[in-house]
Amino acid sequence: MCARMAGRTTAAPRGPYGPWLCLLVALALDVVRVDCGQAPLDPVYLPAALELLDAPEHFRVQQVGHYPPANSSLSSRSETFLLLQPWPRAQPLLRASYPPFATQQVVPPRVTEPHQRPVPWDVRAVSVEAAVTPAEPYARVLFHLKGQDWPPGSGSLPCARLHATHPAGTAHQACRFQPSLGACVVELELPSHWFSQASTTRAELAYTLEPAAEGPGGCGSGEENDPGEQALPVGGVELRPADPPQYQEVPLDEAVTLRVPDMPVRPGQLFSATLLLRHNFTASLLTLRIKVKKGLHVTAARPAQPTLWTAKLDRFKGSRHHTTLITCHRAGLTEPDSSPLELSEFLWVDFVVENSTGGGVAVTRPVTWQLEYPGQAPEAEKDKMVWEILVSERDIRALIPLAKAEELVNTAPLTGVPQHVPVRLVTVDGGGALVEVTEHVGCESANTQVLQVSEACDAVFVAGKESRGARGVRVDFWWRRLRASLRLTVWAPLLPLRIELTDTTLEQVRGWRVPGPAEGPAEPAAEASDEAERRARGCHLQYQRAGVRFLAPFAAHPLDGGRRLTHLLGPDWLLDVSHLVAPHARVLDSRVASLEGGRVVVGREPGVTSIEVRSPLSDSILGEQALAVTDDKVSVLELRVQPVMGISLTLSRGTAHPGEVTATCWAQSALPAPKQEVALSLWLSFSDHTVAPAELYDRRDLGLSVSAEEPGAILPAEEQGAQLGVVVSGAGAEGLPLHVALHPPEPCRRGRHRVPLASGTAWLGLPPASTPAPALPSSPAWSPPATEATMGGKRQVAGSVGGNTGVRGKFERAEEEARKEETEAREEEEEEEEEMVPAPQHVTELELGMYALLGVFCVAIFIFLVNGVVFVLRYQRKEPPDSATDPTSPQPHNWVWLGTDQEELSRQLDRQSPGPPKGEGSCPCESGGGGEAPTLAPGPPGGTTSSSSTLARKEAGGRRKRVEFVTFAPAPPAQSPEEPVGAPAVQSILVAGEEDIRWVCEDMGLKDPEELRNYMERIRGSS
């Protein structure tokens, strides 16, 4: 139909409305053409349950406008899951079930790079040193397993092997992950020939994971081959010729600067501090006062230039502090060619640390420096500077935070429950040892609107008050003089939520009555003729049901305050948060509809309401969706049946996120074996172009029956939850067709309600290529003798849920019973038609296009009629010239006759019927107007009147010609017998005065008065 409509051509209409009419027709045809080309597919799928097991945090995700996915059908279903937290202890399982069948598979490991092999562990690698020197040729890398903790003694943790690649060769070293922390440090010594004396080179670091081995250390030998592309990158490390000095410079005043080492010192270690002096310093005496706590001593003061300065050292011991006084005297002058502002080394002060530091914990030793000049107060506070020395028995190299996850999905605004990520702080020693120092650190979040940190610095969290998300948000940690930063990605929901309903208008289902209090039109009391009818009177019409899903996009804002968002998975992906917000979702008007289990909307009575989700923190509305329940009636057109004889499952990894997993399950429908159990998946197709799985409806409201053409081919199945199932006792090589019918439940299946609402057919096994599968009937039809299993029937069988299952042989039906049930079906249809309340139906896009085309044709017809009326009115205004004399008389036809026969006039007058006698009058030629000539009056109504005027003028020197004007009046309805047929009626036009007709008399040659008088009498007699 669409092709014919789109391809039809019409002639271009004329008139001023023609172009507009063509445009309207073109638009209407285009609407119909687009609708035909974009007919959507039915959103059907196999309603099997897909769930993740042993996954700490995961979400179902879907693309916008793609649910179910395009590859779903009655026999298959696809779902995409997003796993956020890693699973280092146990691999999660994905289970697919459709009772009584179930299967499960292990989720494949993550793939961090497209070319890499999947690994079962999620590892974070941190390089401790950015550069190494020949004095310290060790490259240290910390490996951390993200996820939960492990109990002590866990023997399943793997080994991490570090690979260093240099143009001069390769080096390898491994470590085994330690329980509790789930971390280890590889300390790889780089060969000395890799270092260059003149330039800086670079070595690339990568790692691989391998199972732990027996023996010391738990890892294999270091003799490893090149890992190739399977190695995961760590980064690079610089190989420098010498160790750059690590120190800090602090000015004591405008002329003197203090340079101190910037590294922890160990007990018993000797170190020095240096004083720098500007060349423009002119004082000859300088005193330096140093105060130290117990455990630290000043051993010596040495001038850097003994020829210019001398130093004297004095020590004073106190109860809490030791004071050292160094007096410097100038011994010579500075060289004149040096720059005045240039700094030069002036004095070296040596310190030593005592061996005992308090049990291996790093401590600080404050050192107070103060300059004194002659004439200055000795305790001037403005010249004091305090320097803290970190003293530790361990060679601490770095402070590193260990987080269980590097990204956080902020669902706290939806649930009101804070989300936490545990954090631990460890120090890395020179020998590769790890020590936790979480209790001693300080911390601060760089952006509290995105992420917060706990007071104990052992976790970062979101509480629901955060306003946005971000990528790479920073949290700073510090311990003594060591600092470290942790960067995480926080995904925040974009509100409002999207609430998707499978049907936003719920209507009554014609003929489907269920037990319970009346929620729709009440049944008439006259139907209660017996006990069964009284029970059926308590039934009411079933309303449609709709599935509901709550979705939300998650995004991260840029840290620089820009507006460009980064979406989780992509801008067209949504996370299913139904399991989180279902406790906070409700129907605004519970009388109109109700929400069952947070997943199914049930219509109660006609009305308009909405489904809304309120925030548990502020009671604000997070999302809202309108819902209408009408007393319009729809019919169940057919049952779409899919037999399930087993479940198969496949899993695949996605590319948008490392935790993306897509699961697809199929229903196995091979030829059933004897005693094969078969489950039936049912979809209800309604007349309002919607479909719904039978799982949306209460099992007690479904009266289902299954029949087979072969007697004894099927038996009732055991309990299967919400699914309908049978046991096939045997099937031929070509398969077995099953007929499924939907009935009202048994208490409401009385009298006129015994006819099936709809039926469908399923084929067990693959149908032959030459014999197509039976079509799904749209109306109930009785099958030939067969075997039938009924659900919700009268017979009770253990194992059914909601309705009971029975088995009966259906070998023959009486004609009387069939006719009776057909009559009841017709009565039911008539009654339901009377119960229907006129209401606007759902209009599809195709119907809209047809209505638009019909409207265009109506407009064209209207324009044609208007043009016709305008045409008629326009030409009615144009009147003939002689209509002014008598506008009511019909317009005669004027004929002109030319001739030379003078007797023609007499011949015409003889044909005229004689009129009534006229009075005598004088000749107009003589009287000159003394009397009035008779005037020609119109004839009686319906009569025939003709008038002729003959005009002849005399031609010079020749024969006169005549011009005769003959006027024919409309023909009479019937001619008189005496009048000859075909004789024209002629009347002469006479005038009253002599002046008017004198020239006529002269032209006719009548000059004698007697001739004129006779002529006039003849004229009067003829008129």
From Swiss-Prot:
Protein name: Transmembrane protein 132A
Compositionally biased residues, Acidic residues: 824-836
Topological region Cytoplasmic: 874-1023
Species per Swiss-Prot/TrEMBL record: Homo sapiens (Human)
Subcellular location: Golgi apparatus membrane; Endoplasmic reticulum membrane
Family listed: Belongs to the TMEM132 family.
Signal peptide (residue range): 1-35
Extracellular side: 36-852
